[in-house]
């Protein structure tokens, strides 16, 4: 696997020099300063590429080129946004960056309720609390119809949870959910947030699939002409939330996506932490079945909690519910399969969402993206990969 690291650009508190010391050789990056929907010019791409390469690193993957909300709903100026997206892909490919991660999650990117969940060892992790999220939906946002998404027991627990919250806690929970986590390009007020949700009224899972298929059908000719691979990131968490459909959550979703848009340029990001939240997702089976379409991997683990099967926190990379041993083995099998047919390019892998720990506890960091926790995760995965290669792979 190619060892990569997500870098949020020149303002990231984790520098490129830090990343080199962590042992990564590839950078996962995006031009976050360019508004959603606008074309990334070659000038801006090359400027960022030069900054990365000056440190002896490679811009391996774009994460992400954001998909404008009007593309997802096929409303307003959606065709102009698609045309802009196509031009951005052309520009990236012509500048030598040929793998693009993206997602098709409506309104929100990845979602957590607690950004400082304390682990038994004193480090801090990210957490999604089903009851806290229900309290937000039912009593803070007051989304019409939200009751249908929760059991009676969950509704009662959510009311008790809300009644025990202080004003500061209400503000913090609201901010955690709607203000935008790292990598998300949009943040909202409560009123703006509800207005965005309302735009999806009448858009079912099947309808959103149609919109995604149209979007990809427009992009594939550009991707095929330039050898640029798209790698869709799964929904996080991988289930419907806020009354919104989610369409990249299960192996059945991947089956549909690859059959509907069969171009080899229509690929996948295997994010084990996202898919792994669902107990019915067999990650190794997913990799074995769709390995040829995996162009990027995020390796992390989550732990479903006993209090509620929908509640989870981010575990250490080799702990939790993800069988990292067999996941890495399956990825290495796919790399070997490719090498046997002449494709020796390694699959980019980044250690995702490390715990905030040690000296980073005293620093301001991007949630999930502190340096030391990811350094630990990368070292653990690197060691696992090396041991597996020495034991089982001789070619």
Swiss-Prot record:
Record's keyword annotation contains Cytoplasm: no
Catalytic activity: D-mannonate = 2-dehydro-3-deoxy-D-gluconate + H2O
GO molecular function: ferrous iron binding; manganese ion binding; mannonate dehydratase activity
Keyword Glycoprotein set for record: no
EC number: 4.2.1.8
Alphabetically ordered keywords of this record: Iron, Lyase, Manganese
Lineage: superkingdom: Bacteria
Pfam family, one: UxuA
Cofactor: Fe(2+); Mn(2+)
Protein's GO biological process: D-glucuronate catabolic process
InterPro entries referenced in this protein's UniProt entry, alphabetically: Man_deHydtase, Xyl_isomerase-like_sf
Pathway(s) it belongs to: Carbohydrate metabolism; pentose and glucuronate interconversion
Function: Catalyzes the dehydration of D-mannonate.
HAMAP family in the cross-refs: UxuA (MF_00106)
Record-linked PANTHER family: MANNONATE DEHYDRATASE
Protein family: Belongs to the mannonate dehydratase family.
Protein name: Mannonate dehydratase
Organism: Vibrio parahaemolyticus serotype O3:K6 (strain RIMD 2210633)
């Amino acid at each position: 696997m190619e060892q990569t690291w997500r870098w949020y650009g020149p303002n990231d508190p984790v520098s490129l020099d830090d990343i080199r010391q962590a042992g990564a050789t590839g950078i996962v990056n995006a031009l976050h300063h360019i508004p959603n929907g606008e074309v990334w010019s070659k000038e801006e791409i090359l400027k960022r590429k030069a900054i990365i390469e000056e440190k002896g690193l490679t811009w391996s993957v774009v994460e992400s080129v954001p998909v404008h909300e009007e593309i997802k709903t096929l409303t307003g100026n959606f065709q102009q946004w698609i045309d802009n997206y196509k031009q951005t892909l052309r520009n990236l490919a012509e500048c030598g960056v040929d793998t693009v991660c993206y997602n098709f999650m409506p309104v929100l990117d990845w979602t957590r309720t607690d950004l400082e969940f304390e682990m038994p060892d004193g480090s801090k992790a990210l957490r999604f609390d089903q009851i806290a999220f229900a309290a937000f939906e039912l009593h803070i946002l007051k989304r019409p119809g939200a009751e249908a998404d929760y059991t009676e027991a969950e509704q009662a627990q959510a009311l008790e949870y809300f009644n025990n919250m202080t004003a500061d806690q209400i503000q913090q929970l609201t901010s955690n959910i709607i203000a935008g986590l790292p990598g998300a390009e949009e943040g909202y007020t409560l009123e703006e947030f509800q207005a965005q949700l309302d735009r999806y009224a009448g858009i079912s899972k099947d309808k959103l699939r149609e919109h995604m298929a149209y979007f990809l059908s427009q992009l594939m000719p550009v991707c095929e002409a330039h050898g640029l691979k798209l790698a869709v990131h799964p929904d996080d968490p991988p289930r419907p939330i806020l009354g919104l459909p989610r369409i990249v959550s299960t192996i059945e979703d991947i089956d549909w996506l690859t059959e509907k848009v069969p171009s080899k340029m229509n690929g996948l990001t295997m994010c084990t932490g996202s898919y792994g939240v669902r107990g019915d997702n067999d990650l190794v089976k997913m990799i074995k079945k769709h390995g040829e379409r995996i162009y990027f991997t995020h390796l992390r683990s989550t732990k479903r909690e006993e209090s509620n099967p929908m509640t989870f926190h981010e575990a250490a990379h080799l702990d939790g519910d993800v069988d990292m041993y067999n996941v890495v083995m399956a990825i290495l099998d796919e790399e070997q399969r490719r090498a046997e047919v002449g494709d020796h390019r390694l699959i980019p892998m980044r250690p995702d969402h490390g715990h905030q720990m040690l000296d980073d506890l005293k620093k301001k960091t991007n949630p999930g993206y502190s340096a030391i926790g990811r350094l630990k995760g990368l070292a653990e995965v690197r060691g696992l990969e090396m041991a597996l290669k020495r034991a089982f792979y001789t070619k």
